[in-house]
Amino acid sequence: MLSRTRAAAPNSRIFTRSLLRLYSQAPLRVPITLPNGFTYEQPTGLFINGEFVASKQKKTFDVINPSNEEKITTVYKAMEDDVDEAVAAAKKAFETKWSIVEPEVRAKALFNLADLVEKHQETLAAIESMDNGKSLFCARGDVALVSKYLRSCGGWADKIYGNVIDTGKNHFTYSIKEPLGVCGQIIPWNFPLLMWSWKIGPALATGNTVVLKPAETTPLSALFASQLCQEAGIPAGVVNILPGSGRVVGERLSAHPDVKKIAFTGSTATGRHIMKVAADTVKKVTLELGGKSPNIVFADADLDKAVKNIAFGIFYNSGEVCCAGSRIYIQDTVYEEVLQKLKDYTESLKVGDPFDEEVFQGAQTSDKQLHKILDYVDVAKSEGARLVTGGARHGSKGYFVKPTVFADVKEDMRIVKEEVFGPIVTVSKFSTVDEVIAMANDSQYGLAAGIHTNDINKAVDVSKRVKAGTVWINTYNNFHQNVPFGGFGQSGIGREMGEAALSNYTQTKSVRIAIDKPIR
């Protein structure tokens, strides 16, 4: 009996340790009470093959509310073996389900998903505000565009056409558009849900399957929305969501031989690295990268309207916008007038709690981003830029920065050349059209530009000459689901939204049929 007891003791300890691991394992869903008082259930597991699961290595990370610096919840962290499992599920779903269903089935699922986003729009907007720090004003705008874009993608699903090609009477020749397969998608933290829709929408419409990595700082909305995919009728394995680091999940997706395409939105430096890694397996790559966009104000513009557009162009979403109009060029004859108007308008903007309905600018997304922005303030001052307003942290808790204007800058200053990704704008003066075009184009980036003038001939001329993928005239940060968006130069490759986005997710096959008896 004694020997039996001794022999059983190790097994008892193993059993006890197993129980401890089981009960200490982080949950796959948690109830969260939003700052507006509403409670919802937040998925916290990896979403693989239609289920929320713990990561194989049981690693987790905390998600922080940028507005109060407090922990929201803990989320499972994917590693390489989780990526492999998700890719295998996506590959199987592609081969056996999604690529072979009738296009109208994919269309209906995307329409359903758009409807579900609308149904849960207030919850999704609140999740974005809590997780990202953006104001509800911004978050609601994001969610509205998400549903519109998913519906647009649904409309394209049964309109992916090939061509019949005249190659003479001895052959019948045609081309068809086919999906690629498993698509790896890596989205940023500034527009989590919007970028989720920009990535999965065209991929699903064209018959591909997806393994998507949200940013570590903002994974919650993508996880919540993944369960809406199930409800919409999208089969298991078609959409997989893997919270985790870029160095692990992003790297593995970019290198994985069964991933046929990578779509990335983020920094130019990371985009370059992804291209290098993806080149080993010759993947199709689309990149939406950084920007340092010019916003030009001519003397004949409606100056009050121009000032509002300038502010919206740089301070919207706390300045965390890839196409933010961060370089302002004002014609010399109205320079001081516009600068004063901009100062007054900037100081009227309310900064603070994202759930305050009167707040325009919420928090920066992370402590890291907050200090990066404040470091650029110090750099600008040291280089001799004139601080007009802002230039400091707002409050003592939360990652808030006062909207900041620097004037009288020189074109070789770092604050003019480098992407800050925050609520900081530089202001310069110009005299002639040729002068401002030269300054506007003196950048490695080419994502967007703004032009403010009441002279339509001048507007068209300048829009042709400025090197940017999107040009806004007498408006800024004005998006539509059917208008392609993407950059020139080191701002990226490929286009998001509109018909142009679909080509990123298809490949062309040509078919020639020999005709024994010539067709007459």
Swiss-Prot record:
The active site is at 288 (proton acceptor), 322 (nucleophile). GO terms for cellular component: mitochondrial matrix; mitochondrion. Keywords: Mitochondrion, NAD, NADP, Oxidoreductase, Transit peptide. Present with 23300 molecules/cell in log phase SD medium. It catalyses: acetaldehyde + NADP(+) + H2O = acetate + NADPH + 2 H(+); propanal + NADP(+) + H2O = propanoate + NADPH + 2 H(+); propanal + NAD(+) + H2O = propanoate + NADH + 2 H(+). Its EC number is 1.2.1.-, 1.2.1.4. The record marks 190 as: Transition state stabilizer. It comes from the Eukaryota. SUPFAM superfamilies: ALDH-like. NAD(+) binds at residues 266-271. The activity increases in the presence of K(+) ions: 15-fold with NADP and 40-fold with NAD, respectively. GO terms for molecular function: acetaldehyde dehydrogenase (NADP+) activity; aldehyde dehydrogenase (NAD+) activity; aldehyde dehydrogenase [NAD(P)+] activity. It is found in: Mitochondrion matrix. Pfam families: Aldedh (PF00171). Residues 1-23 form a transit peptide. This is Aldehyde dehydrogenase 5, mitochondrial. Belongs to the aldehyde dehydrogenase family. The keyword Ubl conjugation does not apply. It comes from Saccharomyces cerevisiae (strain ATCC 204508 / S288c). Pathway: Alcohol metabolism; ethanol degradation; acetate from ethanol: step 2/2. Minor mitochondrial aldehyde dehydrogenase isoform. Plays a role in regulation or biosynthesis of electron transport chain components. Involved in the biosynthesis of acetate during anaerobic growth on glucose.
